[in-house]
Amino acid sequence: MDALERYIHDLSAPEEPLLHELDRETNLRAVAPRMLSGHIQGRLLEMLVRMARPQRVLEIGTFTGYSALSMAAGLEEGAELHTVEVDDELEELAQSYFDRSPHGKKIRLHIGSALDVAPALGGVFDLVFIDGDKRE
């Protein structure tokens, strides 16, 4: 960890236990665990959501759900986050953590290509986080 990362880490709130557990399980089970957003990025996403106060959020690229859980923590009651993951093998892992989180009721997990799923969701999204295949 370089000096800037250490500084940011020291000033950030501690990682939530559930997110820490998800980080650990992702590193043990996922093929490419480096794709996980992680603690600092998660805190940044939560802060951005709190500042923007969106009612509808779209995330493209769920992976194991860390960023979705982080953003959901920043959502106000009644707001919703739709997250789209193309890899159906990650569905059970991500959903299990959404189900255990106090913010999980704000999250709707969709499995499939974002090119197909996003238009079917309809409506307007106040915030979109693209963390999936950027080439498409």
Named regions from a protein language model:
Residues 12-16, 30-43, 50:
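Conserved SAM-binding loop and adjacent beta-strand
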